[in-house]
Amino acid sequence: MSTTTQNIPWYRHLNRAQWRAFSAAWLGYLLDGFDFVLIALVLTEVQGEFGLTTVQAASLISAAFISRWFGGLMLGAMGDRYGRRLAMVTSIVLFSAGTLACGFAPGYITMFIARLVIGMGMAGEYGSSATYVIESWPKHLRNKASGFLISGFSVGAVVAAQVYSLVVPVWGWRALFFIGILPIIFALWLRKNIPEAEDWKEKHGGKAPVRTMVDILYRGEHRIANIVMTLAAATALWFCFAGNLQNAAIVAVLGLLCAAIFISFMVQSTGKRWPTGVMLMVVVLFAFLYSWPIQALLPTYLKTDLAYDPHTVANVLFFSGFGAAVGCCVGGFLGDWLGTRKAYVCSLLASQLLIIPVFAIGGANVWVLGLLLFFQQMLGQGIAGILPKLIGGYFDTDQRAAGLGFTYNVGALGGALAPIIGALIAQRLDLGTALASLSFSLTFVVILLIGLDMPSRVQRWLRPEALRTHDAIDGKPFSGAVPFGSAKNNLVKTKS
């Protein structure tokens, strides 16, 4: 940017079309967050009506994560070939239909399947909305674009908590899911009123359709084997999370099978850059493992361990969700100022100071608990708002939506594991201690993975000929792309 441009307030760098694109995507993400967290709010009610164990109830949260990898792949490929806008609309219709089906579910299996549909739609919404907004905004504002967008999910969670306190005590838990059909109306408006992303139009205007990840995996020479592996992964995940397997060794074998399948898909679709893709999946996996025990089981902790009534639960969740939303926006500013990776690490380190006090204070003072949760979620969860920007920078425009959607949503299986791990640990410890221990320990893993730029570092170690040295979204250098102590290591000193 020139000095003159730098003196202009950041928001004036955006025209009306760019703001409209952002507003539409943000509202879509708000509705996504609203629909997705409903199950966490009514988990105890559903558990009681269906007669579920704690682990079975937690698996209803996990179900949406099981299908996300496939939804991210398919809807991401749709976004790469036909445009980000169509993928956004399709995603909203999917998760809205799944939410409505939850309201009619007669039992556990039906609700589990409906949650699978929600997961597919959520995955598509994440990948398509993130790439849509990031590619529509100027390069120097793309951390803000990412952070501001993801704040919509947290705002949706806040709205859901408030609606829960008004609806469920009067009409019951099913009424909450019936409201989830409303986003379909919004999807119809989106289809006619928002422009296509600028980067995608420039790349594909007047050109033949790109060869997407779906083309490579399901229309190429290995299509039969890949279809079989897809069915195998889906079956393995079903048994892991809904099959009530008691043998840890069998679960471990099925988990390793899924990991091998996902790595195979990444190798086929990204070629020599597979080490980067695999490490991005690992980063996201641990990001979900540290954050989603709290996201998924906080309402249960408030209602059971602290014995809060629905109104008090809604108030505390307001602080938590609003803190995460504010953190997404703050993370966007920090990312554009410090650089994406440095902002991520600093924010997570600060959040570590608060995680133990949140669960040590107990329930005597609701306001103090709410304030602690606000700041902990602002620093620990909110910084994930710039994760789409971080991941998207490793992929070219041709495969960005599918690449972001697939890597993020395979890693998001950590969100499926997280509530179940939390519930299992809570069988030996109290739930608050289990949540604090998981979050505190696993956050350090994410700090190391992102701080050391392990995707670039592992790419350099294994396939250096395909190493990308600069972020494909904002053009800034990757710190892990250069050996430490190299004459070219001035990249490390540059914001990245």
UniProtKB/Swiss-Prot annotation:
The listed locations are: Cell inner membrane
Where does it mainly reside?
membrane
Matching Pfam families: MFS_1
- Catalytically driven reaction(s): N-acetylneuraminate(in) + H(+)(in) = N-acetylneuraminate(out) + H(+)(out)
Gene3D superfamilies for this protein: MFS general substrate transporter like domains
Among its keywords, does the record have Cell inner membrane? yes
Q: Which UniProt keywords apply?
A: Cell inner membrane, Cell membrane, Membrane, Sugar transport, Transmembrane, Transmembrane helix, Transport
Q: What's any one GO cellular component for it?
A: plasma membrane
Topology term for the membrane:
Multi-pass membrane protein
Single GO molecular function: carboxylic acid transmembrane transporter activity
Keyword check for Ribosomal protein, yes or no. Answer: no
Supply the InterPro entries for this chain: MFS, MFS_dom, MFS_trans_sf, SA_transporter
Indicate the transmembrane segments per the record. Answer: 22-42, 58-78, 92-112, 116-136, 148-168, 170-190, 224-244, 247-267, 278-298, 313-333, 353-375, 406-426, 431-451
Q: What does this protein do?
A: Catalyzes the proton-dependent transport of sialic acid.
Q: Which family does it belong to?
A: Belongs to the major facilitator superfamily. Sialate:H(+) symporter (SHS) (TC 2.A.1.12) family.
Report what the protein is called: Sialic acid transporter NanT
Q: What organism is the protein native to?
A: Escherichia coli O6:K15:H31 (strain 536 / UPEC)
Gene coding for it: nanT
